[in-house]
Amino acid sequence: MSAAGAREIRANTVLPARRRDIELLTADGLRLVGELALPPDRDPVATLVTLHPLPTHGGFMDSHLLKKASYRLPALADIAVLRFNTRGTTSPRGTSEGAFHDARDERFDVAAAIEFARVAVDPVLPNRWLLGWSFGTDLALMYGNDPSIKGAILLSPPLKFAGPEHLHGWATSGKPLVALVPELDDYLRPGEAAQQFSAIPQARVVGVEGARHLWVGESYVRRVLDEIVATVSPGAEPLPTTWDGEVVLSLPEPGTGPPGL
């Protein structure tokens, strides 16, 4: 369904974008499926390479925060959003080859996504940042400290797989790192997160009052998206809450709800 005129942006609002199905080829020979969402009528000013939550607990490229970022940020903030399924993960887009490997061989998946963004020419994908959620934050910390990446935004970081050596690597890189930590998170809450991330002097830990690990609720979605935009494209926030133009209302798809860890 579509309509013209100013409308409130809601959970199921899909704003205009140029959407392209993509495939990533890993160094160990796997094909991963994904999507690149671009601003509808101009080149992007920044790029998010997204890393989804734990696939064994329902995480995939369509986990709701990542999907809503792709629905809104290209049109509202001229930000490109790259989403993909890590090895062995399935979504309506398809299934990536391989099998889940407990954050070990997933290093090849992260590298393939970063390389895709780095070499893109039509259009160039500038100002590249990692956006990880839960398990995806571990992948960002472990494998995302790449010369072509400006920094990282971490949503609900559990620090389950990433170790002190990975935090040290980010500390010595000097790259900005922002961790958005729900007040009521199931795994790592703001106070403990501040202690853990003190190993990275430039890290900024933002506690979000009332939020939980899955960020359910439109107010939390808007808070997350505003923090993302403030980090990668300062001055473009706060995002509008209405859209004066064509919109599409998405239909719920099986299995696209909030993920686990």
Label each region the model flagged.
Residues 211-223:
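Catalytic histidine-centered segment of alpha/beta-hydrolase-like enzymes
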Residues 198-214:
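Catalytic histidine neighborhood in serine/cysteine hydrolases
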Residues 1-26, 30-40, 135, 239-258:
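An N-terminal hydrophobic leader/cap segment in hydrolases
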Residues 23-25, 30-38, 44-122:
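Serine-hydrolase catalytic machinery in alpha/beta-hydrolase-like enzymes
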Residues 165-167, 188-198, 220:
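Short alpha-helix in the alpha/beta-hydrolase fold that links the catalytic acid
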Residues 131-140:
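Gly/Ala-rich beta-loop-alpha elbow adjacent to hydrolase catalytic centers
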Residues 160-161, 183-188, 213-214:
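Acidic catalytic loop of the alpha/beta-hydrolase fold
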Residues 173-174, 178-181, 185:
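Short beta-strand/loop motif that positions the catalytic acidic residue
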